[in-house]
Amino acid sequence: MASKREASPSLRMRKIVLVICEGETEVGYINLLKMWYRSPIRIVSHIEGTKITPALVEKRTKELQISHLDKVNTFLMYDMDVRTINEKLQKCKAQMLLSNPCFEIWLLLHCKDQKAAINSDSLIKELKKSANVWKNYSKAAFKETQKAFLNNNTDVAVKRAKRLCEFQNPSTGIYKLIEMLKNLEGKRKE
């Protein structure tokens, strides 16, 4: 009878999540997800924001594949408020985590439903009014109270986001990444 040995680390498939982001706020949020889910998330610099192309996405994905066994799930986390970038994104081979009009719709969904179309400036104002933790919201970094609020209200934000029509204003696909991370986390615990 053959012995059951665990595959050596070099022969095991690594699951890697690559999130190519548009800006600093998105990168900050992905860093929170890395902390909360302890998942192998790799973030490509937000400097690539407007320079996004199918070739760039393919290059970044291949850079992470150390072995042919590595499985890289590539996501693009972008705002839909710039039409020229939307056209570039549609040509890329990756899962879309698009927010319409902008990333802050995801933050707002942690507080309340938003079903009416809204522009980016009005959305930021609405976010700041929605809960005390967002009163002094700044795109640069999340405060500790905001991090805790996001973590505690993620499930309700996912439910709200799933009820919105993808790519319409308002909408966000960020919930897809959350669901995948929860699924990976659940499998790791089994």
Regions found by a protein language model. Give the residues of each.
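Conserved SAM-binding loop
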Residues: 19
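Helix N-cap/beta->alpha junction signal
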Residues: 22-23
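Structural motif
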Residues: 52-60
